[in-house]
């Protein structure tokens, strides 16, 4: 019984080797020859166009791999196994029945055109871009600011007007003003006794 199983396995291996000698692989002899003859790109997972294969053995479309390499110029690694990869470390793959024998690495996909949206027109004087943006800058030494003239005449002051008396915002501002005055008086008193 063991000899029958051994002879059966040897006959099946000889028939598969005969099929391989005729140019058929095991996948093609099953009737799916057209489906197994295409290769999939490891980036877009679609049928590869202008196929290239890396030295580590992974297959890619050249446009996909080119975009991968262009977006990572400082760290060029294989998308699958992270081995070193570059334009010179890939091999073009030509299949049976392909019409073009041109190296796909020679044709790089065109770079997309940049689009610049037009800036919004706010109108009026921008004050070098600082007036409307809520940015205010003043400088001085101690209690003597150099912007006294600009502060006194309210030139290019982007702050809102003070709150009207009697509103909740006005009472909150008055409370904070008194609180900070009290803290300042405490600090001055502490400096005097220290």
UniProtKB/Swiss-Prot annotation:
A family per Pfam: zf-C3HC4
CDD domains associated with the record: RING-HC_RNF185 (cd16744)
GO term, biological process aspect, one: ERAD pathway
Keywords, comma-separated and alphabetical: Autophagy, Endoplasmic reticulum, Immunity, Innate immunity, Membrane, Metal-binding, Mitochondrion, Mitochondrion outer membrane, Transferase, Transmembrane, Transmembrane helix, Ubl conjugation pathway, Zinc, Zinc-finger
SMART domains: RING
Ranges of biased composition (kind: Low complexity): 1-27
Topology class, membrane: Multi-pass membrane protein
Subcellular location: Mitochondrion outer membrane; Endoplasmic reticulum membrane
Spans through the membrane: 133-153, 174-194
GO molecular function: ubiquitin protein ligase activity; ubiquitin-like protein conjugating enzyme binding; zinc ion binding
GO cellular component: endoplasmic reticulum membrane; mitochondrial outer membrane
Region feature (Required for ubiquitin ligase activity and protection against ER stress-induced cell death): 31-82
Gene3D superfamilies in the record: Zinc/RING finger domain, C3HC4 (zinc finger)
Domain of life according to the entry: Eukaryota
Enzyme class, spelled out: transferase
Primary localization: mitochondrion
Enzyme Commission identifier(s): 2.3.2.27
PANTHER family: E3 UBIQUITIN-PROTEIN LIGASE RNF5-RELATED
Entry's free-text remark on domains: The RING-type zinc finger domain is responsible for E3 ubiquitin ligase activity.
Function, as annotated: E3 ubiquitin-protein ligase that regulates selective mitochondrial autophagy by mediating 'Lys-63'-linked polyubiquitination. Acts in the endoplasmic reticulum (ER)-associated degradation (ERAD) pathway, which targets misfolded proteins that accumulate in the endoplasmic reticulum (ER) for ubiquitination and subsequent proteasome-mediated degradation. Protects cells from ER stress-induced apoptosis. Responsible for the cotranslational ubiquitination and degradation of CFTR in the ERAD pathway.
Name of the featured protein: E3 ubiquitin-protein ligase RNF185
Organism whose genome encodes this protein: Danio rerio (Zebrafish)
Gene: rnf185
């Amino acid at each position: 019984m063991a000899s029958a199983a051994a002879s059966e396995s040897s006959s099946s291996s000889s028939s598969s080797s005969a099929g391989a000698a005729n140019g058929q692989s095991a996948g093609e002899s099953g009737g799916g020859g057209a489906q197994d003859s295409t290769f999939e790109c490891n980036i877009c997972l679609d049928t590869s166009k202008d196929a290239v294969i890396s030295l580590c053995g992974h297959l890619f479309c050249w446009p996909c791999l080119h975009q991968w390499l262009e977006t990572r110029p400082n760290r060029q690694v294989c998308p699958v196994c992270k081995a070193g990869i570059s334009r010179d470390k890939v091999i073009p793959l030509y299949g049976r029945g392909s019409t073009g024998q041109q190296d796909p690495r020679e044709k790089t996909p065109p770079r997309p055109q940049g689009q610049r949206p037009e800036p919004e027109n706010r109108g009026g004087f921008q004050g070098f871009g600082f007036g409307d943006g809520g940015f205010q800058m003043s400088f001085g030494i101690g209690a003597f600011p150099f912007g006294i003239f600009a502060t006194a005449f309210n030139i290019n002051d982007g702050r809102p007007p003070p709150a009207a008396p009697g509103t909740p915002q006005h009472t909150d501002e008055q409370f904070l003003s008194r609180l900070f005055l009290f803290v300042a008086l405490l600090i001055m008193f502490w400096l005097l006794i220290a």
